[in-house]
Amino acid sequence: MIPFKNTPWGKPIIAQEIAPGVWVVATASHGGFYLNTDALARIPDAHQAYAARWSHGHGPNWFEEDVAACAVIVAFPELIVACPELFDAESVEDARAIVRCYIDREISQ
């Protein structure tokens, strides 16, 4: 069962659990990831705070697809095996670079 009825970006069109507690979500206009409390524990607090800024008041469980989602990909490298149609080793390396260049840089300022 989907643990949410709405997202920060509107009503979900697609919501699929791709790993325990990790949901990929798409709406008509945007998307990202939703993490339950157990999955969220794998995300560093600073990355959760960064993601919460883009969740439009929906809290730290939402990671928008443009930048914040990279924190999820880095924290869950097993998504390469669980979802090879969405992720590969290059996806994880790209996500690490984005976390380093954007998220970590912004939270350190």
Label each PLM-derived region with a short phrase:
Residues I2-D38:
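Short N-terminal "domain-start" leader segments
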Residues A19-V22, S29-G31, G57-N61, A95-I98:
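Generic structural motif recognizing short loop/turn segments at the entrances and edges of beta-strands
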Residues V25, S29-G57:
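A short, structured beta-strand/loop element
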Residues P60-Q109:
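Short, compact, well-ordered microdomains
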